[in-house]
């Protein structure tokens, strides 16, 4: 028996790409899903200027580049750039030959059919992988929490999904998608900091605001109460040092920004908050499975990392649910990477090995095989 070849697991998010080997407990590579191209061509001849940069390198050279995110709201919109990101993942980050490893990719729930086919085609035709599988992100997060039934609230940088899952299958009619996630909260924080007199406008400055958000923001258990506390004392204020050494102070912005998750109306959005969306999704499911869903509400993705979010969610859902219902929020500490971790678990299961689409099957049936083998 030759040595088992590890499968490659790649979770392509709107904001960050997480990649690594099946069986590992964390991704080896985490980098921004960005492709940057020089704004001006060939000013410095012989400077070895590349025509495109990916990930951290694009981020560090952002001053001279135009940055683009090929994944918007969880769905791939630019395939040329997406191919560059995968190329970078295989050859520069993981340093592997894709033609030697099975590849597991993740996709957003309710991803258009044509997108899955295009993904399949690129993996087999451009990268010559021996085998391929595509899995729904929320389902992988649920596996990572050790469950096969539950409702997943997956909120990343570009999109938020609520996905009820029963015995390993998502229930498509009850899936909800909200185009509000980390990127929108960063924008909102930029806006309310501007009202305090701190203006951040360029794409480079936006990254600073994202850092402020990740380090200092939290979700209030009682928003009105917290606003009152903040106005009466400086106990909630925190200071932050900007890259140039200037120190700024932020107060109620710390909890006003993430409050948009529960009150999207502050962003001018019509959708209900994440608690209402979750409740509505449960109500669209069969009455017999609701108890299992209320008792297994699983948080996943970077935008669920705010301190206080679980307690607030518990409070809000309990208020909406039938009075005797047991509501349980599961927020694993590693939830930022739980989609990837679920993929790592799935791809290393012995029972999963017959699930892969092989190169041979692809050659015989073409890209549409993905709909028959991956669900």
Curated annotation (Swiss-Prot):
SMART domains: ACTIN
Keyword Calcium: no
GO MF entries: ATP binding; hydrolase activity
Family annotation (InterPro entries): Actin, Actin/actin-like_CS, Actin_CS, ATPase_NBD
EC number: 3.6.4.-
The protein's enzyme class: hydrolase
Pfam families referenced in this protein's UniProt entry, alphabetically: Actin (PF00022)
Sections of the chain in a coiled coil: none
Any single GO CC term annotated in Swiss-Prot or TrEMBL for this entry: cytoskeleton
CDD domains according to UniProt: ASKHA_NBD_actin (cd10224)
Catalytic activity: ATP + H2O = ADP + phosphate + H(+)
Keyword annotations of the record: ATP-binding, Cytoplasm, Cytoskeleton, Hydrolase, Nucleotide-binding
Compartments where found: Cytoplasm, Cytoskeleton
Family: Belongs to the actin family.
Function: Actins are highly conserved proteins that are involved in various types of cell motility and are ubiquitously expressed in all eukaryotic cells.
UniProt protein name: Actin
């Amino acid at each position: 028996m030759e040595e088992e070849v590890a499968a490659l697991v790649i979770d392509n998010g709107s904001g960050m790409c997480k990649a690594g080997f099946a069986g590992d407990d964390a991704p080896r590579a985490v980098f921004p899903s960005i492709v940057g191209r020089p704004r001006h061509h060939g000013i410095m001849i012989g400077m070895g200027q590349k025509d495109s940069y990916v990930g951290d390198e694009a981020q560090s050279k952002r001053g001279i580049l135009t940055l683009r995110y090929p994944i918007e709201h969880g769905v791939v919109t630019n395939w040329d750039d997406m191919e560059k990101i995968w190329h970078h993942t295989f050859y520069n980050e993981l340093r592997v030959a894709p033609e030697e490893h099975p590849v597991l990719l993740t996709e957003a729930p309710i991803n258009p059919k044509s997108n899955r086919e295009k993904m399949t085609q690129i993996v087999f035709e451009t990268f010559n992988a021996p085998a391929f599988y595509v899995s729904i992100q929320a389902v992988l997060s649920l596996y990572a929490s050790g469950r096969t039934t539950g409702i997943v609230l997956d909120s990343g940088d570009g999109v938020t999904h609520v996905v009820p899952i029963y015995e390993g299958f998502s229930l498509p009619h009850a899936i909800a998608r909200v185009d509000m996630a980390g990127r929108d909260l960063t924008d909102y924080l930029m806006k309310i900091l501007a009202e305090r007199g701190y203006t951040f406008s360029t794409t480079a400055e936006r990254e600073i605001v994202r850092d402020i958000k990740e380090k200092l923001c939290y979700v209030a258990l009682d928003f009105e109460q917290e606003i009152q506390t903040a106005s009466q004392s400086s106990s909630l204020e925190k200071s932050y040092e900007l890259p140039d050494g200037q120190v700024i102070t932020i107060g109620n912005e710390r909890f006003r920004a993430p409050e948009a998750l529960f009150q999207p109306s502050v962003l001018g959005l019509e959708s209900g908050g994440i608690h209402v969306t979750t409740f509505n999704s449960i109500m669209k499911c069969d009455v017999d499975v609701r108890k299992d869903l209320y008792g297994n509400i699983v948080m996943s993705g970077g935008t669920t990392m705010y301190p206080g979010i679980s307690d607030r969610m518990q409070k809000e859902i309990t208020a909406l649910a039938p009075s005797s219902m047991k509501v349980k929020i599961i927020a694993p500490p590693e939830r930022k990477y739980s989609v990837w971790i679920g993929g790592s678990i799935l791809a290393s299961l012995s029972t999963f090995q017959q699930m892969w689409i092989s190169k041979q099957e692809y050659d015989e049936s073409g890209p549409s095989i993905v709909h028959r083998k991956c669900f």
